[in-house]
Curated annotation (Swiss-Prot):
Residues 70-86 have a biased composition (Polar residues). This is RNA-binding protein Hfq. Residues 9-68 form the Sm domain. Residues 63-101 are annotated as: Disordered. The lineage of its organism: Bacteria, Pseudomonadati, Pseudomonadota, Gammaproteobacteria, Enterobacterales.
Length: 101
């Protein structure tokens, strides 16, 4: 399970840290909008006019309103991406390589 979260944790943490507005689409088609306030292994706390606890198993898609840099510079298996932890070092922007043709 740690392997699956190695993508979602840095992504959600970047959304939370940068306060990026997001649209979250649920599997039943409902669209929720707000900012990621916090998250854990099972839920995302989405804040708009109220805070909503959204279970991850009900989420189909998370769409940020703008691009975010979510590459993790931490070794795999690290659990430093959960809400409440402080990054140990400032994140440096990285560029995706588009060498594939």
């Amino acid at each position: 399970m740690a392997k699956g979260q190695s993508l979602q944790d840095p992504f959600l943490n970047a959304l939370r840290r940068e306060r990026v507005p997001v649209s979250i689409y649920l599997v039943n088609g409902i669209k929720l909008q707000g900012q990621v306030e916090s998250f854990d292994q099972f839920v995302i706390l989405l804040k708009n006019t109220v805070s909503q606890m959204v279970y991850k198993h009900a989420i189909s898609t998370v769409v940020p309103s703008r691009p975010v840099s979510h590459h993790s510079n931490t070794p795999s298996g690290s659990t430093n991406n959960y809400h409440g932890s402080n990054p140990s070092a400032p994140q440096q922007p990285q560029q995706d390589s588009d060498d594939a043709e």
